[in-house]
Amino acid sequence: MKPELGAACGAAHYPGKARPAPARGCIALLFACVCVLLASCGGGEAVRSNAPSSASVKMPRSWPVVTPEDPERANAVLMRAIGLVGTPYRWGGNTPESGFDCSGLVNYVFRDMANVALPRTSRDLAASKGPRIAPERLAAADLVFFGNGGTVTHVGIYVGEGRFVHAPSTGGTVRLDHLDSTYWRAHYTGARRVLR
């Protein structure tokens, strides 16, 4: 007489009722949800940046101090952005109480401190008006963009000395990072000056 499969596998060892494997529909739904979360800061139609591809962007050896065109508003943006470090990331979030995604953080800070209305997604921000800025000409409150193959998927606020504030991803918090880090250097697509 053959032993039952459950006995051979030690099924009695696991508590609870045996459950059937998830249906394909559930797996497809889970996959779709994960894809939506991975798109986090994106949104809208894909916009190709006219900035050089990340492979050709050279970061300066040292980060020169560049005076912003509007120092008072740039300082207000800078201080507010740094003050939000530690706020939880939340996809679609745009307030300190609810948390921030990358473009929600940028929108909130510029609206709150400089009375500037900006587009809501990182892609739309990259395509918005304002001069493109070379890495060695970055000034406080400039927007820095990241992505793959020229498609913008992420945005942060430059604060000086090669550093920027951003809301990175699910499970993280608003934080300071350095443009010289391996990841951000490889994904850098360009910068724009909003305050003029």
Regions found by a protein language model. Give the residues of each.
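C-terminal motif of bacterial Sec signal peptides marking the signal peptidase cleavage site
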Residues: 37-40
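Catalytic cysteine-centered active-site loop
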Residues: 64-65, 87-140
